[in-house]
Amino acid sequence: MQTVNYRKGLGAMSVCFFVWGFQPLYWYMCTNVCGEIDTFFIMACRIIWAAVACLCILKVQGKLPQLWAVFKDKQVLKREMPASVLLFGDWLVYLWAVQNGRVLECSLGYYIQPLVVFALGAVIFREKMNWRHFVIIAIVVVGIVFSTSGFGGVPYVTIALALMFSIYAAIKKSLTIDSIVSTTSEILMMVPVALLFILLFRMGDNGMGSMTVIKQLLMIGGGVITGLPMVFYSIGVRHLPLMTTGICQYISPSLSIICGAIMGEALTREKLVSFLFIWTGVILYVLNTVYEEKQKKKTAAE
């Protein structure tokens, strides 16, 4: 039974990160098809349709009462509101980067994000660090510094995504509510802003006035590919060890590199060297995690 659950969890988690990894191609297609429609309008549509998709998922799962409970709990809202702001910023920067041919910077940001989370854990939650952790972080920092040459300047997209999502993850760590319920509440908090933006600035030809059936379907699809992976993620988290989940999350940025190549971004020598430093840090981080997990089991057995 345990093996079946593990396979179920691994399959669900793989689907989740594969969808996230290939998302740049979807948003790139939206940009090409929608043409004159800008990042902000696509962002607003993504929020609205993601909210619809997540609400439908919660309805099917019978978790809507849990969602309404979130909005009645002031202590939970104090954490969910800043999480919503950070998620909004992450989505906006990500969409802008995809539309402006900077997918590789996104990939770099999501590679280092788990390491930034670890560093934040040491600072905020007083989690212990040993000399191996400092070596890993130093290697990653060198990679980021080197990326200023490969990307023609400071990789603001990389830094912004890594920091925002890391702080977001730190906030989520302090929450005990269901992951889909939590994310849905954060998206619902964005909906008024999205609706107000469309009503005030995008009712003409630069927005709703130019929406054909195809464009509308693409926007709806954007909501689906935002909400649906969360279902698979929640299944995976329930059936997989935390260490396996941590390793799986590197699927997404790896696939994003492929997306960048398909979209015409050049992986220059300078960029490759930067990625090599990051990959080295990631590999050492994973190996160290495996080693520490084995040591814990060994200590517990004694």
Each model region followed by its residue ranges:
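Glycine-/small-residue-enriched transmembrane alpha-helix faces in small-molecule transporters
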Residues: 1-41, 142-174, 259, 297-302
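Membrane-interface interhelical linkers
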Residues: 1-15, 51-81, 131, 188-219, ...
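C-terminal-most transmembrane helix of multi-pass membrane proteins
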Residues: 2, 47, 150, 250-302
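Hydrophobic alpha-helical transmembrane segments of multi-pass membrane transport proteins
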Residues: 14-22, 26, 81-98, 160-171, ...
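Membrane-interface helix termini and inter-helical loops of multi-pass transporters
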Residues: 25-39, 66-69, 99-102, 144-145, ...
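Hydrophobic/aromatic residues within transmembrane alpha-helices
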Residues: 30, 42, 46, 81, ...
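Helix-helix packing/entry segments at the starts of transmembrane helices
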Residues: 45, 107-112, 179-189, 227-261
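C-terminal transmembrane-helix exit sites in multi-pass transporters
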Residues: 96, 113-132, 254-273
